[in-house]
Amino acid sequence: EVKYDPCFGHKIDRINHVSNLGCPSLRDPRPTAPAALRIIRDLHPDSKQSQAA
């Protein structure tokens, strides 16, 4: 008997991207834009905030 898996998880191209259609519990591990901007701001010591100090 083959069990139905609502998470497809099939490879969709040759560089191993995987489809997670049907899996709302799986999140994209990439940071959101505001989080990425905070990281970039914190990594650059030449930002305007650090020059004011």
Swiss-Prot record:
By its UniProt entry, which InterPro entries does this protein fall under? Natr_peptide (IPR000663), Natr_peptide_CS (IPR030480)
Chief subcellular location equals secreted
> What biological-process GO terms show up in the record?
regulation of blood pressure; vasodilation
**What tissues has this protein been observed in?**
Expressed by the venom gland.
Q: Which residues form the propeptide?
A: 39-53
The protein's UniProt keywords, in alphabetical order, are: Calcium-activated potassium channel impairing toxin, Disulfide bond, Hypotensive agent, Ion channel impairing toxin, Potassium channel impairing toxin, Secreted, Toxin, Vasoactive, Vasodilator
Which GO terms of the molecular function aspect are on file? hormone activity; potassium channel regulator activity; toxin activity
Family indicated by similarity: Belongs to the natriuretic peptide family.
- Establish whether keyword Disulfide bond is in the entry: yes
Looking up PROSITE patterns in the UniProt record yields: NATRIURETIC_PEPTIDE
> Could you tell me which cysteines form disulfide bridges?
C7-C23
Tell me if Disulfide bond is a UniProt keyword of this record: yes
The free-text function statement in the UniProt record for this protein reads: Exhibits vasodilator, natriuretic and diuretic properties in animal models and human tissues. Acts by stimulating cGMP via the natriuretic peptide receptor 1 (NPR1). Is a poor agonist of the atrial natriuretic peptide receptor 2 (NPR2). Is not degraded by neutral endopeptidase (NEP/MME). Binds to atrial natriuretic peptide clearance receptor (NPR-C/NPR3), which may be responsible of the removal of DNP from the circulation. Increases calcium uptake and induces histamine release from rat peritoneal mast cells.
From the Swiss-Prot or TrEMBL record, give the protein name.
Natriuretic peptide DNP-2
The entry's cellular-component GO terms read:
extracellular region
